[in-house]
Amino acid sequence: MIHGVLNVYKEKGYTSHDVVAKLRGIVKQKKIGHTGPLDPDAEGVLPVSFGKATKLCDLLTDKDKTYQAVLLLGQVTDTQDTSGQVLEKHSTEDLTNEKVENVIRSFEGEYDQIPPMYSALKVNGKKLYELAREGKEVERKARRITIHEIRILEINLPEVKLEVTCSKGTYIRTLCHDIGQKLGCGGCMKELLRTRVERFGLEDSIRLGEIAQLQKEGILEEKIIAIDEMFPTYAQVVLPPKTAAAVRNGNSFRKRDISQETALKEYENDERVRVYDESHQFIAIYCYCRKDDLFKIVKMFFDGNEKK
């Protein structure tokens, strides 16, 4: 079984679930999960976790993301992108590049974004897009998100090409809609390309066809990033056999329990570390609590089927 993360390039026309289903067929492995959905009409970086790395999905979903998007001004749709039904059309003749730039840049920083009806968020156990398809609209709570940076790549009205770096939970479709509303002419998203999720960029992403070929040649695992390599900034902690056995059961441990080779480091409060046994088998991610002088479990990656 493969354990690790693969940087997949999701092509247009596929849902993120479609990508996972196709990968299961390619590698003949069920335990696969993606780390944050992309709309079917969007494309770009989609990190996919295999085997024990599926425990990473929530950790990767929390990471900042970067997108390139094309904003179409003068048009409002029910889906907030050009795939939806047009609800309004307005002239953009009075817009100037300067006004557009100023309004777009005003969205940098934190703002309360209302999720779109056409989204996978659930209300009372039902997905919003299912309600939307039934012609229903329900009240959605605004969510505080952060737009770290917006770069305006090109203005060719009524279209504007943007690069957006943002926090988790940000809907670029909704950002486009909100920019249009603030400009007074409406707007929607025409194109979306996700260019980065944390360490994963377009430059090393792999399309499904290439993945199938690599698997056929028996070299796909060369492209898989090992679980512990996903945390390159975390210090490594090596444990002697007795402590390692306890840690495999999720027990906490103290600094004095660490093998000599990694015991000399001073650990900050709440610092996360990668925990290994003396054969350098990766076990878990732990966090140091200075008050108790204890390392406490964050995420376990060892399972009982592995050799100890």
Predicted regions and their residues:
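Catalytic cores of RNA-modifying enzymes
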Residues: 1-167, 177-206
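Conserved glycine(s) of the Walker
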Residues: 171
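Accessory RNA 3′-end/elbow-binding domains used by RNA modification enzymes
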Residues: 1-12, 17-38, 42-45, 98, ...
